[in-house]
Amino acid sequence: MYKKVDSSKSFVDIERDVLKLWHEKEIVKKSFNSNQDGEYFSFYDGPPTANGRPHVGHIITRVMKDLIPRYKVMKGYKVPRKAGWDTHGLPVELEIEKKLGISGKPQIEEYGIEKFVKECKESVFSYVSLWKDMSEKLGYWVDMENPYVTYHNDYIESVWWALKQMWDKDLLYKGHKIVPYCPRCGTALSSHEVAQGYKDVKEATAFVKFKVKGEENKYILAWTTTPWTLPSNVALAINKAYDYVEVINNGEHLILAKALLTVLEGEYEVVSEFKGEKLLGMEYEQLFKFANPDKKAFYVVHGDFVTLSDGTGIVHIAPAYGEDDNMLGKKYDLPLINLVNGEGKFVDEVEPWKGLFVKKADPKILEYMKENGTLYKSEKFTHSYPHCWRCDTPLLYYPRDSWFVRMTSLRDKLVENNNKIHWYPDNIRTGRFGKFVENVIDWGISRDRYWGTPLPIWQCECGHRDCVGSIEELKEKGINVPENIELHKPYIDEVKLTCPKCGKPMTRTEEVIDCWFDSGSMPFAQLHYPFENKEVFENTFPAQFISEAVDQTRGWFYTLLAISTSIFDKSSFENCIVLGHVLDKHGLKMSKHKGNVVDPFDVLDNQGADACRWHFYTSSAPWLPTRFSQEDVAETQRKFLSTLWNVYSFYVLYAEIDKFNPNDYKDFVSGNVMDKWIVSRLNTLTKDVGNYLDSYGITQAALEIQDFVDDLSNWYVRRNRSRYWTQELTDDKVGAYVTLYRVLVTLSKVAAPFIPFMTEQIYQSLVTSINEGAEESVHLCKWPEYDESLIDSSLEEEMKLAISIVKLGRSARNGANIKNRQPLYEMRVSTKALPDYYGDIIRDELNVKKVEFGADLSKYVNFEIKPNLPVLGKSYGKLIPKIRKEISSMDQMKLAERVRSGEAVKIDVDGTEIELNSENLLVTMQGLEGFAFAGIGEIGIVLETTITDELREEGYLREVLSKVQNMRKESGFEVADKIEIYVSGNEKLENVIRKFEDTIKKETLATDIIYSENKEAAIYNINGEELNVFVKKNC
């Protein structure tokens, strides 16, 4: 009837079987097409770049993104799940440069832009088969047959439409600014790209002496972390509100901030002290004479950004290489001296270092200044410096003509929209993301590269500019535009427009746009909106759920918000789970260099998807760093998946023996207390998991399921095994079967979004195998409805207390080194009495004859109370020895009871009144001789550990039963097989066996016990006594 559980199959084998089933029955497709009349639930899949291999970080994003849409489908929502691929930009171009053995823009242009772009286009799906394979094995259900692709014309056209909207709102402009610039890639970068590439570097700084003009031996001492910018110096900045001094140091007069005199070496004498304002206008001699400025230069100016945190309180100013410097240069009309070319190398005018990359020139510049006496000193300084997020080259702040989106004009709206987003964790709103938004600068979107969405702006030599927002507009305004125009360079560059002002041809500006603009446009561009799918867009915008790694606070999350705010005046997403980084098993960042990278395919092929998924759901909150290794995933598999699988296997094994069909008992209601309890727990679970998932509490929901499975296996099934072993199909046995069946079926649905493979296998075996009209897959089922009338909170609380008491009893046994199979006489419990039913359970579980509730444990326990030094020591450090003495002089039991009850106890030590409580005292309790104690919170138990002869005999009996049952299992006997038992070699134990012979036969299905030797017998240690035992199947 049920599908037999094949013990030879691993979980990975089972997952392969499930994948085959999904393919054969087109389950994924049916899931996508389900709930067509339902309310939309919108989810956006952030596009990865498919020209690189997937890594373990992509597993966590996929398992988190997969769960919520699965749950919403089961709740009846219509959930479009469109996959996407990010195909433009530097990541692709750099790979092609490596492939072709070329480097940099000159070599690309020598190779040929058209050929280079074709190579880029052909490469973007190099690893798509690996991505699809990983996603399929992981059970990540998104539509990969009809993905959005950022290089497709339809997608680009939608991006052009967005840029046109910005153009019409005067948000798009061209400016000459200092921008973060990658000399290796030859292009400017945006602030959010820069934010992803900061690294702590240790570099040489320079304390430089600028000779005061007209003074023989007087210098202004300035400090810089970028010596390469010194040849372009045109001014020095001070803060006019600070105090400055002139000192004599090593025979030279030096000027610097008073607060930073400690930077000086050797002794010094302060000659005068004055406000910075006195220095304004002071002139000094040009440090390097590689260029002749065309404006007034080389004098002291005021800068608000000058601080006293480092250096000398005097900053050298080179307007060509820094935003603050550039703004100050504009304020004072300073000359801009740029001595660095687009490759980040010094131009020919800088004779000593021409053609040298500026960062490599730093030590040579320092040596040069040391030789000519302008270097006061140089020190190593660790600071955070931006590097290219893709090629790792140190960035330069460099003057460039670039196109910008006027994000500063939208700052208030960005902040307002950010505050409406539900971030998980919440501190992202005001912290990492919020701070970035509050300090937003204009977005430099143009890139001087080749493979990307072309900036759709055409310019005329008369100065007129126009932005094109669609292919139709391009054909209307363009001259001989090809019918099937390819919207990439170099083809689009050949299209000319006629200038409406002067009639001359207009040429497209050469740049492509930031590839992050592509991905941030996906809410509408994936649908080719507004040219198609207007209704679908309106139903799915904004997204109700997105999730990616924390890095995307500077990437996709920002561009989504920036673009949607500028066009639609609101955020494009409502709820976002921000995922933490995946670390190795030691908590270290994974890297090829360290050799600690875990291949996702190794884990999927060895431990399987469900184990992988469950590990990420339960190991920590999604936004915290997660340790990940094959060992960790294997442990997750053993503790949770194996436990659930064993419960399912247990049911199938016995239900098959009894040919039990739950369809014959659809209306059966069990009156058994344990059945009522597990049904109550199941309905509470269904309710709580649904509530957690509705509020994106993935980890809380998963842990609830984990706790339930633990209760189901280690309490319900274990406590009820004997009900399945009875020969007749009594009402009690039917109740046990019906209850476990219903629990497993409902649990398969509740856990389906989390562990889609195992739940499918359980559902297929328990449901589709016996119900022809059932849904084909658990993933096509509706989320189970909980029944409030079946939830008994009192019953759950009572059982929870009973379980806690049992756990404490086991702990006390372990502490006394007494096995659970050894019966004990009595256990005393501090809590109020439970109904008799639970007393029976506790006695049976802990193998004790008697349980006393509401007991006074003080008679059996020794109390020891000590000061909690980290707490008391802070306030009363010197008094601790006397506090300890005072505590030890008090009645320990009474003090412990008062403290445990929450009372504050006051003592006087050397005239100081000190209040003792549960926070500043450590109370430990240990059982007196003959007793074992364990406690937690308000629950305490004491076991009487004295073992009488009668109890010892019962202990022997339990051990013999355990050994025989294990021998049955190891011999491969079926559950219903009858056996014969041979025992010999120990007269004492043989007498015990004779005494309990009927019990042993009943428990082990033995037809006979033979007291004679058998050559094949195994020797067992039975509580210190040796016994020869052999079992054989009774034919």
UniProtKB/Swiss-Prot annotation:
This protein's GO CC annotations: cytoplasm
Molecular functions per Gene Ontology: aminoacyl-tRNA deacylase activity; ATP binding; isoleucine-tRNA ligase activity; tRNA binding; zinc ion binding
One Gene Ontology term from the biological process aspect of the record: isoleucyl-tRNA aminoacylation
Localization of this protein: Cytoplasm
Top-level taxon of the source organism: Bacteria
Primary enzyme class: ligase
Motif 'KMSKS' region: positions: 589-593
E.C. designation(s): 6.1.1.5
Residue positions of motif 'HIGH' region: 48-58
InterPro entries: aa-tRNA-synth_I_CS, aa-tRNA-synth_Ia, Anticodon_Ile_ABEc, Ile-tRNA-ligase, Ile-tRNA-ligase_type2, M/V/L/I-tRNA-synth_anticd-bd, Rossmann-like_a/b/a_fold, tRNAsynth_Ia_anticodon-bd
Binding site for ATP: 592
Catalyzed reaction equations: tRNA(Ile) + L-isoleucine + ATP = L-isoleucyl-tRNA(Ile) + AMP + diphosphate
Entry comment, domain topic: IleRS has two distinct active sites: one for aminoacylation and one for editing. The misactivated valine is translocated from the active site to the editing site, which sterically excludes the correctly activated isoleucine. The single editing site contains two valyl binding pockets, one specific for each substrate (Val-AMP or Val-tRNA(Ile)).
Job description of the protein: Catalyzes the attachment of isoleucine to tRNA(Ile). As IleRS can inadvertently accommodate and process structurally similar amino acids such as valine, to avoid such errors it has two additional distinct tRNA(Ile)-dependent editing activities. One activity is designated as 'pretransfer' editing and involves the hydrolysis of activated Val-AMP. The other activity is designated 'posttransfer' editing and involves deacylation of mischarged Val-tRNA(Ile).
Subunit and partners: Monomer.
Family annotation (PANTHER family): ISOLEUCINE--TRNA LIGASE, CYTOPLASMIC (PTHR42780:SF1), SOLEUCYL-TRNA SYNTHETASE (PTHR42780)
Protein name: Isoleucine--tRNA ligase
Organism: Clostridium acetobutylicum (strain ATCC 824 / DSM 792 / JCM 1419 / IAM 19013 / LMG 5710 / NBRC 13948 / NRRL B-527 / VKM B-1787 / 2291 / W)
Encoding gene per record: ileS
